[in-house]
A protein has these predicted regions:
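Bacterial Sec-dependent N-terminal signal peptides
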Residues: 1-33
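N-proximal helix/coil linker or "cap" segments that precede and/or mark the start of modular domains
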Residues: 270-326, 335-345, 372, 391, ...
């Protein structure tokens, strides 16, 4: 049951997105919908609006490509200059309420695709489209959606659903191996679709038509997430392979998708993938075409993310900065050398915090409690206050004075004028921020919480 439940969710929840188009056709595509059955049961009414929308790498357009008002049993929508891609047909009720998805269709060959005819019905709280005329792939897509909706409603069982989907897949392969619907089937209905190697082999990234679809972007994201337990180096290689193998029109979209996926990665250190991909494929564009595609605001945010993170990634030498303590004495951190006895190693913890931050107020006592009971390799903690009020700093310093642990050396520092440039060098755009280095200043942990810090310290001390 698990496999078919997954497939039903995948197809029923087809996402909508904005559209630009790839190839022009000499003429228009007409979509003729016979809505008699849906009107008779009240699912569609006169005065309702039916619209066609398309995709640009999984994003739905805000404006319809074509729309019409229901006046009788049938409605004809004309898609001028129909292009290759994936489309959805939406219903907006005159009385208001949620916009509903009536059906989907593909245009795989824009030059020969001229007309689609469907009968629209409504049951099981879902619309059903029966293909009457048009491309063979859309007849199969209508069958697929009907089977999935029947399965979701419980009107057919797991065995019947499997037989239906397998039959549709076989007919798709026999009908037109180059159709967009066939690519969708390869990615979702093949018995090998849980194999990472198989999915990579059938991702149609060399096909420029898939830029204007939703299903390929979803497959790329699922593919990358299935590999997230790999090392950062391996993930960077995998990400670059995706971008490099793609058609030139797809490259910036795939690179942006990878950047967005890894910039806030749950697994520590994987933000390095976002930095590397952005530097190579989004910011290294002398023509300015990528900046124009992304828009200035998005382009600037990517550039800022890279600049704020590229100096303090895991495995790097932590940037050297000088900060004063409460007596005005400058401390150069991180210290790069061995322990105080000339042989023993130590760890160095950077903790950037302030007083008017609710997260800091929650984190500081947890960190102090952790360091109080810590036993292991000696730690130097640099408690770096990012505020500008000396009195508030002194008050915050008192919270760390409770740490009475011979394994922990605390140094309170601040930089009210930001002369050290620590926000840029250490990516401190918000507080609290924690970063751990070795006694040589090599970064071994970043974006830490008290819990993840404790887990990292346990792992280091076990080794």
């Amino acid at each position: 049951m698990e496999r078919w439940s997954y497939i039903s969710l995948l197809f029923v929840a087809l996402l909508f997105g904005s559209t630009q188009q790839l190839r022009s056709a000499e003429g228009a595509l007409r979509l003729r919908l016979n809505c008699k059955a849906a009107i008779e049961c009240g699912a569609i009414s006169k005065g309702d609006t039916i619209a066609i929308k398309g995709f640009t790498w999984g994003e739905l357009s805000t404006a319809p490509l074509s729309y019409g008002i229901v006046k009788g049993r049938s409605i004809i929508l004309t898609l001028q200059n129909a292009k290759c891609g994936e489309y959805v047909v939406e219903l907006r009720r005159r009385a208001g309420g949620k916009v509903r998805n009536i059906m989907e269709f593909f245009v795989s060959d824009a030059e020969s695709h001229r007309e689609e005819k469907y009968a629209i019905s409504y049951k099981n709280d879902a619309f059903y489209a029966q293909a009457l005329e048009g491309a063979a792939e859309n007849g199969l897509l209508a069958e697929l959606n009907a089977s999935i909706r029947d399965f979701s409603a419980g009107t057919i069982g797991n065995k019947q659903a499997k037989e239906a989907l397998d039959s549709i897949y076989s007919k798709a392969l026999a009908s037109d191996s180059s159709a967009l619907f066939t690519s969708l089937c390869r990615l979702s209905l093949d018995n090998r679709c849980r194999s990472v190697r198989y999915i990579r082999s059938v991702l149609p990234l060399e096909d420029p038509r898939v830029l204007y679809t939703n299903f390929v972007k979803s497959s790329v994201e699922s593919y990358l997430k299935s590999l997230e337990r790999n090392s950062t180096e391996a993930l960077t290689f995998i990400a670059e392979d995706l971008v490099q193998s793609a058609h030139s029109t797809l490259k910036p979209y795939i690179a942006l998708q990878i950047f967005n996926l890894f910039k806030e990665a749950e697994i520590m250190g994987q933000e390095a993938v976002a930095v590397e991909i952005a530097k190579r494929y989004l910011l290294n564009d002398e023509s300015g075409s990528i900046e124009e595609m992304l828009g200035y605001e998005t382009y600037f945010s990517i550039m800022a993310f890279v600049q704020m993170n590229e100096h303090s990634l895991i495995g790097m030498q932590a940037p050297q900065i000088e900060l004063p303590d409460s007596l005005g004495c400058l401390h150069s951190i991180p210290q790069c050398g061995e322990g105080s006895d000339g042989a023993s190693p130590f760890l160095q913890l950077f903790y950037f915090y302030t007083s008017n931050c609710s997260s800091c107020r929650a984190t500081t006592p947890l960190l102090a409690e952790l360091l109080q009971r810590y036993s292991g390799i000696p730690i130097k903690i640099y408690a770096i206050f990012t505020g500008s009020s000396r009195s508030e700093w002194m008050s915050e310093c008192a919270k760390f004075s409770l740490i009475k642990n011979p394994q922990v050396e605390r140094i309170d520092l601040w930089d009210p004028e930001v002369e050290s440039n620590f926000p840029l060098l250490y990516g401190v755009i918000s507080t609290p921020q924690m970063l751990l280095t070795t006694d040589k200043g090599i970064i071994v942990g970043r974006r830490l919480t008290p819990k993840s810090l404790e887990q990292l310290l346990e792992a280091i001390n076990e080794n």
